[in-house]
Curated annotation (Swiss-Prot):
Disulfide pattern: none
Protein name per Swiss-Prot or TrEMBL: PEP2-like protein NECHADRAFT_97050
Purpose: May contribute to the ability of the fungus to cause disease on pea plants.
InterPro entries: NTF2-like_dom_sf, SnoaL-like
Source organism of the structure: Fusarium vanettenii (strain ATCC MYA-4622 / CBS 123669 / FGSC 9596 / NRRL 45880 / 77-13-4)
Taxon lineage: Eukaryota, Fungi, Dikarya, Ascomycota, Pezizomycotina
Amino acid sequence: MVDLHSLPIGSRPSAAIRNNGPDRLVLERLKLRELAEGWPSYRDSCEWENFESIFHPGAHVYTTWSGRVPYQDFITASKAGMDKGAFIMHRCHGTSTDINAEGTRAVTKLKAIITQRFEVDGAEFDVEADCRFCFFFEKVGSRWGAQLVRHWYEKDKMIPANPARFPAVDEERLKGYPPGYRYLAYWQEATMGVKVLLDMPGHRRHVGTPNLEKHDLLYRQAKQWLEGEQIEI
């Protein structure tokens, strides 16, 4: 049986600094927190120029509905989705940054809730997905920027705006979606005209799924990044 209370052996970047440490790295971590929290602050408010400032040229974004795309394409797709009625917002709940001693590479994890409003057959409801963003940051010259942004999708649920009206759900079709973002994937496919990826990183408890494998892989990639290696984007 999988140990549900531990992370994969050897996945912790032991040489990285994540709290305390020298004051110069505290300042760098504050900069990285501001960048990470810029994702929900900027994207949800359509502040696209500010959103672009999070990334380095050539950076990629990897989400359930977009797949792996250059960040500029993600912005274009986000705008198009909004114009078609997609209403996605985020709530942030804290950050933690691992940074190398040189202050040139970092991984910031941002706990958040993705909340998407849907309207189906006259019923308004939100799907809320607990997740963690994973930002792969690099300092080029004097400027920090993300080279890759991914997520762990941990659990989700449906919340009716009006408890008296709730949409019908095809239980058999629902079973075909991953446990960490089952309702999000179901309704994104049903309403957005997209094919949602089913193998996104999940939670440690998603035993026997590709989502657990990708959960562990993302931790290993974070360690590789902090140790100066190149990762497969």
